C-alpha cells in the first residue's frame, strides 16, 4: 500500500470537481510537490490522472493551491478526449511523475523546444485499470518525445510494479516484444488525438522513435532538477502554485492546518456524479495520411 488516499470534492464531470490527495496521517498534500519522485531504488511514483478507457481529460491543477486533480476546461467547456477509431478514450492509465516539471524557460537539447510547464507525463501499460487520484509505483521502460504546438511534451512509458507481468519488462524493447502494436498505437494516438477538435496532428522528435529506459530516466532526472529550482524559488513559476507541506527547503511550505483550510473552503464531497455527455461515446473516423 502506498499510504496515500484521495478525497473528491463536488461532483465528477462538473467545473467544481476536484480530487485532493492525503498522506498516511490523513493530512492534505500536493500530488505535484509532496509525493516523492522515488518510491524505491529505480522505482518511481505515478499520480494517476486518467484511468484507461476513460475520456474526461483530468490533470493536476498546477496553478491551484495544493494542486488537486480537476477536469481541463477550454473556452468554458469541460474537455473530453475523442474516441478516434479504433481507440476508446485513453489507451493506458495516464498521469504524471510527481516532483518533476518541464520548464517552459528551458529549450530541450534533444527537441529544440521549451517544456510544456507541467509535470512529466506517464503512460502506464499494465493490465489493471487504475483509479483517478491513485498513487502507484512504476518501473520506467522508455520515453517518447512529442512536440505539442511547439512545446516539448515527453511521454514516459512505464508499468505498475504490482502488475503480474512487471518482472518481464526491463526496457522498451520488451514492450515491443510482449505487447506487439502497442507502441505504434501509442504514437498514432498522440499524433491524432486532437484532430477531432480541429487541431493539426502532433509531431515528434527522433522520427517518433521511442528511447530506452536509461534515456528516459535521464530525462526524468532533469525534470526533477527543474522542479527543485521551481519549488525553492530559484526559477519563477509564473503562476504555478508551489504550496507544499513537506519540502523543507521551500519557502512555499505550509503547515497541515493551512492546507486543510484550502480544502474546507470548497464544496463538500458529492455522492452522485453528473452524467457524461452522450457525445463522449461518439466514434471519430479519420483518413490517415
Swiss-Prot record:
The gene is Ppa1. The modification Phosphoserine is found at residue 250. Mg(2+) 1 binds at residues 116, 121, 153. Its cofactor is Mg(2+). It catalyses: diphosphate + H2O = 2 phosphate + H(+). Gene3D superfamilies: Inorganic pyrophosphatase. Its main location: cytoplasm. Mg(2+) 2 binds at residue 121. This is Inorganic pyrophosphatase. One of its GO terms (biological process) is phosphate-containing compound metabolic process. It comes from the Eukaryota. Homodimer. One of its GO terms (cellular component) is cytoplasm. Keywords: Acetylation, Cytoplasm, Hydrolase, Magnesium, Metal-binding, Phosphoprotein. Disulfide bonds: none annotated. The modification N6-acetyllysine is found at residues 57, 228. Its EC number is 3.6.1.1. The modification N-acetylserine is found at residue 2. It comes from Mus musculus.
Amino acid at each position: 500500500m502506498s499510504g496515500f488516499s484521495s478525497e473528491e470534492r463536488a461532483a465528477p464531470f462538473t467545473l467544481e470537481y476536484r480530487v485532493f490527495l492525503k498522506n498516511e496521517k490523513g493530512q492534505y498534500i500536493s500530488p505535484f510537490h509532496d509525493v516523492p519522485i522515488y518510491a524505491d531504488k529505480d522505482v518511481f511514483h505515478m499520480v494517476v490522472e486518467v484511468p484507461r478507457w476513460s475520456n474526461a481529460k483530468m490533470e493536476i491543477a498546477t496553478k491551484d493551491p495544493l494542486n488537486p486533480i480537476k477536469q481541463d476546461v477550454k473556452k468554458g467547456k469541460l474537455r473530453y478526449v475523442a474516441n478516434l477509431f479504433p481507440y476508446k478514450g485513453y489507451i493506458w492509465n495516464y498521469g504524471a511523475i510527481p516532483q518533476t516539471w518541464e520548464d517552459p524557460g528551458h529549450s530541450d537539447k534533444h527537441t529544440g523546444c521549451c517544456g510544456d510547464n507541467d509535470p512529466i507525463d506517464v503512460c502506464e501499460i499494465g493490465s489493471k485499470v487504475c483509479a483517478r487520484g491513485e498513487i502507484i509505483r512504476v518501473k520506467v521502460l522508455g520515453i517518447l518525445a512529442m512536440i505539442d504546438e511547439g512545446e516539448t511534451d515527453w511521454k514516459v512509458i512505464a508499468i505498475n510494479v504490482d502488475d503480474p507481468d512487471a518482472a518481464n519488462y526491463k526496457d522498451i524493447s520488451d514492450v515491443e516484444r510482449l505487447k506487439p502494436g502497442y507502441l505504434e498505437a501509442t504514437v498514432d494516438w498522440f499524433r491524432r488525438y486532437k484532430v477531432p477538435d480541429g487541431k493539426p496532428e502532433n509531431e515528434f522528435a527522433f522520427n517518433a522513435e521511442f528511447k530506452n529506459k536509461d534515456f528516459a530516466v535521464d530525462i526524468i532526472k532533469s525534470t526533477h532538477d527543474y522542479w527543485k529550482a521551481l519549488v525553492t524559488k530559484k526559477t519563477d513559476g509564473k503562476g504555478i502554485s508551489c504550496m507544499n507541506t513537506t519540502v523543507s527547503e521551500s519557502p512555499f511550505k505550509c503547515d497541515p492546518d493551512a492546507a486543510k483550510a484550502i480544502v474546507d473552503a470548497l464544496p463538500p464531497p458529492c455522492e452522485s456524479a453528473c452524467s457524461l455527455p452522450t457525445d463522449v461515446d461518439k466514434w471519430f473516423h479519420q483518413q490517415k495520411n
